[in-house]
């Protein structure tokens, strides 16, 4: 018992101690809570004082509203607020929003002053650089106007009251998203990033570069490209400014890019936003249709059911908020189920007794309207339901105007004082304020089902309703968006004269796009220009608003107007409205003869003069690397000096691949080379002897062999004569061709003209590589992107200038742009002085001798040329078409020619010259325009180089490793490299280039070979080049030189 008593005393002591500790903790908690309460009270008091200060500032600001319109007024004057430069703009905006209701405190940050919303006065040192224009983006060079962040911070921290800014402020909305660091300008940090649909301020006028100085709502300041923003309409801004008188308006509305441009954007953000429904980080783009509009009539507010009796009710309301100068409100209409029961004059009373109602059996909708000089207000903006079976939930929920990405939701509210919460697919989407009963969804997904729930939120508990009726607050509706269909067509299509006489410029206004680039749910990719149902131009850019169209295409279609369609992955839109082409633009220009220079335009003082008219289309292309470039064609048909350097940079150096496996020592490498050389020597010797005997027995071909022809000092190019071309043809006998004889060809790819092209390009390529001693690299710091030739499909490799000649198609194809050395490095003094003198001769100067060429392929520069100015400068032609050429080709490999009374450029690798001695036959051929289909062409001699001026050493090397560039090469243009196996004997020409590559030949294939994969064959081993196939087949096999013929016969 004693132990139990002691134990009880011990427990009682511990209990007392615990109670003491608990009491101390409770006192500590009480003290902390009191401290927190005092802190909150102090904060509340401070905020109240701040509110009073801001209210006074706002009142002073409103007094100057006539002089400065924050939302885009016209006349401006300096705002005389001495504390403006030092007062943070967020405080001012908070005060403005507080006066209007619930503002955008959280959306506005930073420490910029309100004075910073006024354009700064230009400083003496401000000298903006010229505009560097690019399509769709505004460019500007580095400017002294771009101040550092420290300078702007110093200005913000300045306490001086001196006014530094003047100008007017405008509210804008971003049309598209824009990241300055992805743009073309040198100082992207001076520009503001934009998000489509977000608001920003710009102040002052646009500068000469097309930029505004602006500020985002978070305080960021910088330059804004003018073509990326839309100004808010002045009339809607004026209406928005008047809403400050309404105590229940908790938002600021501005005009924006709502559906069809007729509604407004709401700056408030929803509580929850589904990322799949809206793609705007700043908040939803969905709008409340009835918020503000140009013709909104002020409506009565806060209708109240004062008393409900068995046969009557008493209702009251508050007067409308009428903007100054809007108009006069004369009276009120009280309606019951859209029937006017009484009319009350304004100012008498705002209560009404409505009798003759059967409250126990019927439900009535009571509404109050304002009657004004501009019409009556919307009855649903001041309405309530009374009577039997009234519930809190809205009724008649419906969805209209459903498209691929948008829909309009509407309902009938039980009480116009209720706000409503919108749920989309069980996710809270947005809140609609009181007196609103419509909602517009944007950025929906095409072909998707949605479930909408509208939850009514009463402003006060409707105690007059039974409990079960008070609990019914929700209404549902389901709908599905339309499948992604064709996009909307462009608007406001216009046609104007182009930058050149041979083109016109078609402009349009793109359809309204979502921030993700959708129109009607279709992913917009570009725009196409059509004439008589045929596409004549195309631009691949979703926000493009203009493009150039060749007049020759319109003349050939005899089109007098054009339409524009929006292109998308889901198809094309319908045609836009037809835009007529001015008749004066459709008249073909009269061709002018081209003046003839007195000396060779491309000849330099250090190069012996040769007869260019006897060189083929590809001859002397390597000389263009060492001479100044011929001037580009101009529409005045006059030669001009070369222009400044281009904008392209040289391609990166070729990367030397590294062999896989254990490195091979020098001794082993030489042993491998000796073994491989001896292994193939005997078979190579026998094959070579067989080829030699075969060629010796055919004497007529020995004289035309490639090496013999090149080494012959008397060799001289002469095109096939017109007599040879037309001998036995109908054109040579009579002017008309009949008899349905045709070429025995499958297509341009398989024709003899194509074979001629292929042979000559192969020979020219090998000659250039041999002569240059390997691959030539760009040099110097200035580079020019020379015009790239249209490429016939019969060529199959990359030449030394990087041009690609793809195989495997039926006609010329588009090649990728390349960079080549600039001719400006060589200077103007390398050109003949007569070249510049002749450039300024009058049209009466001596004409260049005209030559006759025949087209080897069909060629449409609009779709096949890789050059950006192809539509304006290059000529289209068909296979077999006769082309009149003036002078020699320029450094880019283009002739200046004439077809269909139009002058332009012609790629030399797609035409062949016909030597004409008979002027009468030449004129007749020009009148004919095309070679007759039954013309037998007996012989065409193609371009040949007059001789090799340099002797290039050849060496034999053996491959130490297997190499397949498609698998092992780190370079992009793997087709320029050879595939080989260990032990293959490769002939290399010249020395190693600075990238570590040889130019070599294996099995009739020529290309680049990595030097670290090869070992030179010892001199004491006799090696004959083997034509035995390698273990790997080359991608683009070339015909053996032994099979080449120096003449080509067309079989009728």
From Swiss-Prot:
Domain Fibronectin type-III, residue spans: 297-390, 393-475, 489-590
Keyword Cell membrane part of the UniProt annotation: yes
Record field: compositional bias (Low complexity): 645-654
A Pfam family recorded for this sequence: SH3_9
Chain positions with Phosphoserine modification: 704, 712, 832, 839
SMART domains xref list: FN3, SH3
Subcellular location: Cell membrane; Synapse
Keywords (A to Z) from UniProt: Cell membrane, Membrane, Phosphoprotein, Repeat, SH3 domain, Synapse
Keyword Phosphoprotein: yes
Source species, domain of life: Eukaryota
An annotated GO BP: neuromuscular synaptic transmission
Signal peptide annotation: none
Main location per the UniProt record: membrane
PROSITE patterns recorded: FN3, SH3
Residues annotated as domain SH3: 167-234, 848-916, 952-1019
Alphabetical list of InterPro entries matching this protein: FN3_dom, FN3_sf, Ig-like_fold, RIM-BP_SH3_2, RIM-BP_SH3_3, RIMBP1/2/3, SH3-like_dom_sf, SH3_domain
Biased composition regions of type Pro residues, renumbered to the chain: 585-598
Ranges of biased composition (kind: Basic and acidic residues): 146-156
One Gene Ontology CC term in the entry: plasma membrane
Chain intervals with Basic residues compositional bias: 1040-1052
Family recorded in the similarity comment: Belongs to the RIMBP family.
Role summary: Plays a role in the synaptic transmission as bifunctional linker that interacts simultaneously with RIMS1, RIMS2, CACNA1D and CACNA1B.
Free-text comment on this protein's domains from its UniProt entry: The SH3 domains mediate binding to a proline-rich motif in RIMS1, RIMS2, CACNA1D and CACNA1B.
Assembly description: Interacts with RIMS1, RIMS2, CACNA1D and CACNA1B, and potentially with other Ca(2+) channel alpha-1 isoforms.
Protein name as it appears in the record: RIMS-binding protein 2
Gene from which the chain derives: RIMBP2
């Amino acid at each position: 018992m004693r132990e139990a008593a002691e134990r009880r005393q011990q427990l009682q002591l511990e209990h007392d101690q615990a109670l003491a500790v608990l009491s101390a903790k409770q006192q500590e908690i009480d003290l902390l809570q009191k401290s927190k309460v005092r802190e909150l009270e102090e904060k509340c008091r401070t905020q109240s004082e701040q509110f009073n200060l801001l209210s006074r500032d706002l009142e002073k600001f409103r007094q100057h509203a006539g002089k400065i319109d924050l939302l885009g007024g016209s006349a401006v004057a300096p705002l005389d607020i001495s504390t403006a430069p030092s007062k943070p703009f967020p405080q001012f905006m908070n005060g403005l929003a507080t006066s209007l209701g619930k503002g955008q405190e959280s959306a506005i940050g930073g420490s910029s002053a309100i004075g910073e919303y006024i354009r700064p006065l230009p400083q003496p040192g401000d000298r903006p650089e010229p505009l560097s224009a690019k399509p769709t983006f505004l460019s500007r060079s580095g400017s002294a106007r771009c101040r550092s962040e420290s300078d702007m911070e110093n200005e913000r921290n300045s306490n001086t009251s001196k006014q530094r800014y003047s100008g007017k402020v405008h509210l804008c909305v971003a049309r598209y998203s824009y990241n300055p660091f992805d743009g073309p300008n040198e100082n992207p940090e001076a520009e503001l990033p934009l998000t489509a649909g977000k608001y920003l301020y710009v102040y002052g006028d646009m500068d000469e570069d097309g930029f505004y100085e602006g500020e985002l709502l978070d305080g960021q300041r910088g330059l804004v490209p003018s073509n990326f923003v839309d100004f808010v309409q002045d009339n809607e801004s004026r209406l928005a400014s008047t809403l400050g008188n309404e105590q229940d308006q908790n938002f600021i509305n501005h005009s924006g890019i709502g559906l069809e441009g007729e509604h407004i954007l709401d700056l408030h953000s929803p509580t929850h936003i589904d990322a799949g429904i809206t793609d705007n980080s700043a908040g939803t783009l969905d709008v409340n249709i009835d918020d503000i509009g140009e013709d909104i009539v002020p409506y009565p507010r806060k209708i109240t059911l004062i008393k409900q009796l068995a046969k009557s009710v008493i209702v009251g309301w508050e007067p409308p908020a009428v903007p100054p100068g809007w108009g006069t409100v004369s009276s009120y209409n009280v309606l019951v189920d859209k029937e006017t029961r009484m009319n009350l004059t304004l100012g008498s009373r705002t209560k009404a007794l409505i009798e003759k109602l059967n409250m126990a059996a019927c439900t009535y909708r009571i509404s109050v309207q304002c009657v004004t000089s501009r019409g009556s207000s919307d009855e649903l903006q001041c309405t309530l339901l009374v009577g039997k079976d009234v519930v809190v939930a809205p009724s008649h929920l419906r969805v209209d105007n459903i498209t691929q990405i948008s829909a309009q939701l509407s309902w009938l509210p039980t009480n116009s004082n209720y706000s409503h919460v919108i749920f989309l697919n069980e996710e809270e989407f947005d809140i609609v304020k009181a007196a609103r009963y419509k909602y517009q969804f944007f950025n929906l997904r095409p072909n998707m089902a949605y479930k909408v729930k509208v939850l009514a939120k009463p402003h006060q508990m409707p105690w007059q309703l039974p409990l079960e009726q008070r609990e019914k607050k929700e209404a549902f509706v389901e709908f599905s968006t339309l499948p992604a269909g064709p996009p909307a067509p462009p608007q406001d299509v216009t046609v104007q004269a182009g930058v050149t006489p041979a083109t016109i410029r078609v402009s349009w206004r793109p359809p309204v796009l979502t921030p993700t680039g959708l129109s009607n749910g279709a992913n917009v990719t570009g725009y196409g220009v059509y004439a008589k149902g045929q596409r004549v131009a195309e631009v691949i850019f979703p926000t493009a608003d203009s493009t150039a169209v060749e007049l020759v295409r319109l003349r050939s279609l005899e089109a007098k107007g054009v339409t524009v369609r929006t292109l998308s992955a889901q198809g094309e839109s319908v045609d836009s409205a037809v835009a007529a082409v001015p008749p004066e633009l459709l008249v073909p220009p009269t061709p002018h003869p081209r003046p003839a220079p007195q000396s060779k335009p491309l000849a330099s003082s250090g190069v012996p003069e040769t007869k260019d008219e006897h060189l083929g289309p590809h001859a002397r292309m390597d000389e263009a690397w060492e001479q100044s470039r011929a001037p580009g064609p101009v529409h005045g048909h006059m030669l001009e000096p070369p222009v400044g350097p281009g904008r392209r940079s040289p391609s990166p150096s070729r990367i030397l691949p590294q062999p896989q496996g254990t490195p091979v020592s020098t001794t082993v490498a030489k042993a491998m080379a000796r073994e491989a050389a001896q292994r193939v020597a005997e078979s190579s010797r026998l094959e070579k002897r067989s080829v030699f005997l075969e060629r010796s027995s055919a004497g007529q071909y020995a004289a035309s062999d490639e090496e013999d022809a090149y080494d012959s000092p008397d060799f001289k190019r002469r095109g096939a004569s017109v007599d040879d071309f037309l001998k036995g043809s109908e054109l040579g006998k009579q002017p008309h061709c009949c008899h349905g004889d045709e070429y025995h060809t499958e297509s341009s790819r398989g024709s003899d003209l194509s074979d001629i092209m292929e042979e000559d390009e192969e020979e020219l390529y090998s000659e250039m590589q041999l002569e240059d001693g390997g691959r030539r690299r760009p040099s110097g710091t200035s580079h020019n992107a020379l015009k790239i030739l249209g490429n016939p499909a019969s060529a199959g490799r990359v030449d030394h200038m990087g041009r690609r000649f793809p195989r495997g198609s039926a006609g010329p194809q588009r090649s990728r742009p390349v960079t080549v050395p600039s001719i400006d490095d060589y200077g103007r003094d390398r050109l003949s002085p007569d070249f510049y003198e002749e450039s300024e001769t009058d049209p009466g100067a001596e004409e260049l001798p005209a030559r006759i060429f025949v087209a080897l392929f069909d060629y449409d520069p609009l779709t096949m040329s890789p050059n950006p100015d192809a539509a304006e400068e290059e000529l289209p032609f068909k296979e077999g078409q006769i082309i009149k050429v003036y002078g020699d080709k320029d450094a880019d490999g283009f002739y200046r020619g004439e077809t269909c009374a139009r002058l332009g450029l012609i790629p030399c690798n797609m035409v062949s010259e016909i030597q004409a001695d008979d002027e009468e036959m030449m004129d007749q051929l020009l009148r004919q325009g095309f070679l007759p289909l039954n013309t037998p062409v007996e012989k065409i001699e193609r371009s040949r180089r007059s001789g090799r001026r340099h002797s290039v050493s050849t060496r034999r090397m053996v491959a130490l490793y297997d190499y397949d560039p498609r698998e092992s090469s780190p370079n992009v243009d793997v087709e320029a490299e050879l595939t080989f196996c260990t032990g293959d004997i490769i002939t290399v020409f010249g020395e190693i280039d600075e990238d570590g590559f040889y130019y070599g030949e294996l099995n009739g294939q020529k290309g680049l070979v990595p030097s670290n994969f090869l070992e030179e064959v010892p001199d004491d081993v006799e090696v004959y080049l083997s034509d035995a196939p390698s273990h790997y087949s080359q991608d683009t096999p070339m015909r053996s030189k032994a099979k080449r013929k120096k003449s080509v016969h067309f079989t009728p």
